[in-house]
């Protein structure tokens, strides 16, 4: 039986497979788990077309395999960022584009709900993959933007 892969690219090795290379494959899987547990990445969004995010099986670095995605670029119109139908995960999405336009995070096909991220705002989005034809994405808007506090204080 050959290896199979999860929607986020983690390799599920078959019993007895990959003699001599399973350690490397396991390390790659652990890196993918680390990325999705708390990894950050910036994703450029172009003005001329929508952006498609994907995952390469057994590879690290895919935008979708990160918990926090910051959208960058200069926009003159709202743009869509699409994901594959089988992705089921939650993300922190920040629209850091210039031009005061929305970024819409949605599944590649179907008429399910999407996550609209207003310029300068951050949302928590849960991609449900709840319907193979019209999957939905639920969102929670944050009251304020996420910032890096380099001077935390206790009891004050």
Per-range role (PLM):
Residues 1-9, 14-103, 135:
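Exposed extracellular interaction/assembly regions and N-terminal maturation sites
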Residues 10, 17, 114, 149-150:
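N-terminal hydrophobic or amphipathic segments with adjacent small-residue motifs
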Residues 16, 120, 155-156:
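Glycine-centered flexibility sites
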Residues 21-28, 50, 119-131, 151:
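Extracellular disulfide-bonded cysteine-rich modules/repeats
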Residues 47, 142-156:
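Register-specific beta-strand positions within repetitive beta-rich fiber domains
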Residues 79, 87-89, 101-142:
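Beta-strand-rich solenoidal segments
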């Amino acid at each position: 039986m050959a290896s199979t892969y999860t929607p986020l690219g983690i390799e599920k090795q078959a019993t007895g497979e990959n003699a001599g290379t399973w350690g490397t494959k396991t390390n790659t899987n652990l890196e993918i788990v680390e990325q999705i547990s708390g990894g950050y990445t910036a994703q450029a969004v172009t003005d001329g077309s929508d952006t498609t995010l994907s995952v390469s099986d057994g590879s690290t670095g895919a935008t979708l395999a990160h918990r926090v995605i910051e959208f960058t670029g200069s926009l003159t119109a709202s743009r869509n960022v699409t994901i594959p139908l089988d992705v089921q995960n939650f993300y922190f999405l920040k629209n850091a584009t210039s031009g005061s336009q929305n970024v819409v995070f949605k599944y590649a096909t179907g008429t399910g709900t999407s996550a609209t991220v207003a310029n300068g705002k951050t949302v928590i989005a849960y991609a449900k993959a709840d319907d193979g034809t019209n999957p939905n994405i639920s969102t929670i808007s944050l009251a304020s933007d996420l910032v890096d506090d380099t001077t935390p204080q206790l009891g004050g």
